[in-house]
């Protein structure tokens, strides 16, 4: 059966969660479904979603600053009422309240996805986001499922773990990293270690930087690359300079050629110590 699915995402950043929402949107469209996407206005997700050219795709950017916004609620409710939706799929807290309540009032089934392994506040009324409102709760891994199942009044039979997928059309073992190594001026046989991901607290970039001098003691010619942007970018950039390792570390910022970058690495590091669901870079 072909469905009309409404994705909602209030996050304003660009990381694994937002990438997954966009990937699912594209793949659902490939399978013939109708997809509407309500996303944070002026966000990276909106910018990238605008590149989707498909008559079955509908983009609705809205400024979703608060779950208590009556204007946003009414906008969503009117959209749902005028369109024959089969599912509302929510992702972040703000849009889960707005989309979830709209779904309940309009009789459209709600799916809530929990992407991160951070603790869930199960005090009233927050636990309603996982108990009363959704028909199903999807998580990005078993660890997150176990966290959600501990929330008050949650039916564990409604919690399903679905890890992030990999598009093997893009990530192919035959992809060459030569172009990237040339760009970074990496010599033949020179060791390249990289970390790919949004730069924020729990991603462990500080640990990655602390490990670099230790590695250089053993492999003096090793080079390092940090790929990604985020709220901690300037801080990490300053720490690289302070440590005097600018000639050994390249900060590339956001890149879209991740398959080629991964192919160029000898070692890829995941230094996260919290928050992960299914790290897509792995």
Predicted regions and their residues:
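Membrane-interface segments of envelope glycosyltransferases acting on lipid-linked substrates or membrane lipids
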Residues: 1-282
């Amino acid at each position: 059966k072909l469905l009309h699915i409404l994705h909602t995402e209030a996050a304003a950043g660009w990381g694994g969660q937002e990438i997954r929402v966009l990937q699912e949107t594209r793949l659902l469209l490939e399978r013939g479904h109708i997809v509407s996407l309500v996303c944070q206005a002026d966000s990276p997700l909106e910018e990238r979603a605008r590149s989707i050219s498909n008559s079955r795709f509908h983009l609705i950017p809205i400024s979703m600053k608060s779950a208590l916004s009556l204007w946003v609620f009414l906008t969503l409710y009117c959209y749902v009422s005028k369109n024959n939706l089969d599912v509302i799929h929510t992702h972040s807290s703000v849009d889960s309240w707005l989309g979830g309540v709209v779904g309940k009032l309009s009789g459209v089934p709600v799916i809530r996805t929990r992407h991160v392994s951070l603790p869930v506040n199960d005090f009233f009324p927050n636990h309603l986001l996982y108990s009363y409102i959704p028909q199903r709760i999807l998580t990005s891994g078993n660890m997150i499922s176990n966290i959600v199942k501990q929330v008050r009044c949650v039916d564990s039979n409604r919690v399903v773990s679905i890890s992030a997928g990999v598009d093997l059309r893009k990530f192919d073992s035959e992809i060459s990293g030569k172009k990237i190594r040339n760009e970074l001026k990496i010599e033949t046989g020179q060791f390249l270690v990289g970390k790919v991901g949004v730069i924020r607290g729990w991603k462990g970039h500080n640990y990655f930087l602390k490990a670099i001098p230790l590695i250089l003691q053993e492999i003096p010619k090793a080079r390092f690359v940090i790929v990604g942007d985020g709220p901690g970018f300037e801080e990490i950039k300053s720490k690289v300079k302070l440590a005097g390792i600018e000639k050994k570390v390249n900060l590339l910022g956001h890149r879209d050629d991740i398959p080629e970058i991964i192919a160029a690495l000898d070692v890829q590091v995941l230094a996260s110590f919290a928050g992960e669901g299914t790290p897509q870079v792995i």
